[in-house]
Curated annotation (Swiss-Prot):
Belongs to the PHAF1 family. It comes from the Eukaryota. One of its GO terms (cellular component) is synaptic vesicle membrane. The keyword Repressor does not apply. PANTHER family: PHAGOSOME ASSEMBLY FACTOR 1, UPF0183 PROTEIN. It is found in: Cytoplasm; Preautophagosomal structure. This is Phagosome assembly factor 1. Pfam families: PHAF1. Keywords: Cytoplasm. InterPro entries: PHAF1, PHAF1/BROMI. The keyword Amino-acid biosynthesis does not apply. Interacts with BCAS3; the interaction is requrired for the association with the phagophore.
């Protein structure tokens, strides 16, 4: 049985690990993977058709804990303990819930002190006792007690006291004064762990198509002072097609991983693929997982030839490998009654709305099947790749964009027919 320390408005954890409000989804999953022998039977709950309409939930079924992540920024918003019989809880080092100590209203009052009167919810038949960043829900023993605590009683205060002996049914840790209005806080400095994160990524565009990326980056850097003086730093960097390896390293730092391509599965869709001379060396990617970006370099020139932006939607084959890339892509729209204008595509745009903006149907997609090996099937199904303005949009079956691949301009001297090479 887990023995955990409760820190209101901040975290739930022990000496080895801690779930902290504002923590990115990938870090919480990394904790669960590292301690998989202790924390077992974890479920990932999300809406397959509308992933932005509901929180993304990690349900620790064996321990009675739910971690609720904001559907948009994918940071930890609420920690819910829904079965207190499966876990030991303490506050300031003193247990208020264990096999020997029942979490009664008297015990909560002794451990946490006085607060505003409890609020009664007649639909749930629960009392909610609220502290800043912490709420307890108490179960009533019977319906006969309910009329004593009508919501309109005492000028809006739902109760003057909760029945003696009532025990906690659920506990919530969140940011702010209200569980209903809470939002995931900014990522705590303790969660940066030496990584750089992207607050936003803007695609830079010229007359012919995308030319590079402008990234607004966050880092928890230390100045010349002590480690305790570490604070968040915000800075901007830009990388372009044709930049060298050294240019990218100086702008973004070292990648988390370097991946060498063994084959190009999209080559068959390029003009005259059989005439292309096989290369003796392979193109390679810089994988920046916390930026949600991959950068492909040409094996011969060692210059940028492709950017890949990842949205990290649940239900995609690459889910939880990348941090969500919050991108904005300007699209050139040509309409009969108006001159050329620009519309913005974001991480949260749906593909049908993009097609509607374009005002004309896009060509039929290439169907992409992913699997870890030739004999395995992808449980999430295929995705569809649409080419548009030197970009390829990978679209999931729920109409959300899984990734966007940006291509650089054709090499000088290349034939015009190869300009839209996928």
């Amino acid at each position: 049985m887990l023995d955990l320390e409760v820190v209101p408005e901040r975290s739930l954890g022990n000496e080895q690990w801690e779930f902290t409000l504002g923590m990115p989804l990938a870090q919480a999953v990394a904790i669960l993977q590292k301690h998989c022998r202790i924390i077992k039977n974890v479920q990932v709950l999300y809406s397959e058709q509308s992933p932005l309409s509901h929180d993304l939930i990690l349900n620790l079924t064996q321990d009675g804990i739910k971690l609720l992540f904001d559907a948009f920024n994918q940071r930890l918003k609420v920690i819910e303990v829904y079965d207190l019989t499966k876990v030991k809880l303490k506050y300031c080092g003193v247990h208020f819930n264990s096999q020997a100590i029942a979490p009664t209203i008297e015990q909560i009052d002794q451990s946490f002190g006085a607060t505003h009167p409890g609020v009664y919810n007649s639909a749930e038949q629960l009392f909610h006792l609220n502290f800043r960043g912490l709420s307890f829900s108490f179960q009533l023993d019977s319906w006969t007690e309910a009329p004593k605590y009508e919501p309109n009683f005492a000028h809006g205060l739902a109760s003057l006291q909760i029945p003696h002996g009532a025990t906690v049914k659920r506990m919530y840790i969140y940011s702010g004064n209200s569980l209903q209005d809470t939002k995931a806080p900014m990522m705590p400095l303790s969660c940066f762990l030496g990584n750089v994160y992207a607050e936003s990524v803007d695609v830079i565009r010229d007359g012919t198509g995308p030319s590079g990326l402008r990234l607004r980056l966050l880092a928890a850097g230390c100045g010349p002072g002590v480690l305790a003086d570490a604070k968040m730093r915000v800075f901007e960097r830009a990388v372009y097609f044709g930049d060298s390896c050294q240019d990218v390293l100086s702008m973004l730092g070292s990648p988390h991983k370097v991946f060498y391509k063994s084959e190009d599965k999209m080559k068959i869709h390029s003009p005259s693929p059989h005439k292309q001379v096989p290369s003796k060396c392979n193109d390679y990617f810089f994988n920046y997982f916390t930026l949600g970006v991959d950068i492909l370099f040409d094996a011969n020139t060692h210059k940028v030839k492709k950017f890949v932006l990842h949205t990290n939607y649940p239900g995609h084959y690459n889910f939880n490998i990348y941090h969500r890339c919050e991108f904005k892509i300007p699209l050139a729209i040509k309409k009969e009654n108006a001159g050329g204008q620009t519309e913005i595509c974001t991480t949260y745009s749906k593909w049908d709305s993009i097609q509607e903006l374009l005002g004309h149907p896009v060509e039929k997609p290439v169907v992409l099947h992913r699997s870890s090996s030739p004999n395995n099937t992808n449980p999430f199904g295929s995705t569809f790749c649409f080419g548009l303005q030197r970009m390829i949009f990978e679209v999931m079956q729920n109409n959300h964009i899984a990734s966007v691949t940006l291509y650089g301009p054709p090499r000088p001297g290349a034939h015009l027919r190869t300009a839209e090479l996928p």
